Amino acid sequence: MSADALKDVIGGGKDLYALLEVSISSPEELEAVDAAQLRAQFRRLALRYHPDKRRDDTQQNDKFVSVQKAYDILSNSSLRATYNRWLSCRLFGDPERRRLVRELHQREQLQVRQKEPMDKDIQNIQSYGQLLRKMRHLRIPYGDWRPNTSISRDSTLVETCTLRLLLRQNSTTNSKSSMLQLFQRAKLHIVDLYFSSRNVDTENDLVLYAVMPDVDTMLDLLNNWAVKPPLSEHILQVQPRVHTDYFHFKTDISLDKTITEAIDADNQYMSSF
């Protein structure tokens, strides 16, 4: 974990100990927290919030990321010493100064939240508009344009064609070789199988990831797993590894005035031909 991450945490006024559910009420308690206590809290919370167990709950997934970041910083002795000095001053310093700093920070954060999303989207739209205007000026048909970057088809399909299987935990599903045999009997070709690192032996289910060779095979298993015995006898649920909710955009942003003016100028230019 880098010093930049620590700077962001301090700038955001975050209490990392509170994220790990470690109670701090005095400077002495702050210094008394040891690595073993932090590690135990992280493991407990990681099991509670890990995405493998709460895949559809984005709030819980965000909580897991916050817990991971908190532990990464506090488990680094150098970063933790710097953070503890800041937190001690924030929690146990002058009350009036803390109140003023907190109010100032809240106002700054509100201004950032209101400005940043629109600025970022507008920059992207403006850059895209500049590209289109260059193509039009050079008389390059839009349909002839190709990206100038090379992306491996195999690397993108690994994400697209990976399914998350929730299985009943038993001697068969705990064995990769046994699961490969079940896929073969179901006439499903598999590129790879791997278990989630967060599976727990004492639970009734476990998570297995199946990498399919192509989209058609992936969709076949995703949509028809219930009619593929004997594999289906062990499956509780099948989902894409990359959840489709990540591709939903719910915010509508009005175009910047400079963009609408550029569009009008382009329309006037084209109408002159």
UniProtKB/Swiss-Prot annotation:
A GO term for molecular function: misfolded protein binding
One GO-annotated biological process of the protein: RNA splicing
Alphabetical UniProt keywords: Chaperone, Cytoplasm, mRNA processing, mRNA splicing, Nucleus, Spliceosome
Species this chain originates from: Eremothecium gossypii (strain ATCC 10895 / CBS 109.51 / FGSC 9923 / NRRL Y-1056)
Similarity section: Belongs to the DnaJ family.
Job of this protein: Involved in pre-mRNA splicing. May be involved in endoplasmic reticulum-associated protein degradation (ERAD) and required for growth at low and high temperatures.
One Pfam family hit: DnaJ
InterPro entries (UniProt xref): DnaJ_domain, DnaJ_domain_CS, Hsp70_co-chaperone_J-domain, J_dom_sf
Gene3D superfamilies on file: DnaJ domain
Name of the gene this protein is made from: CWC23
Nucleus among keywords: yes
Example of a GO cellular component annotation carried by this entry: endoplasmic reticulum
Protein location: Cytoplasm; Nucleus
Coiled-coil residue spans: none
Start and end residues of each J domain: 15-87
Complex formation: Associated with the spliceosome.
Protein name: Pre-mRNA-splicing factor CWC23
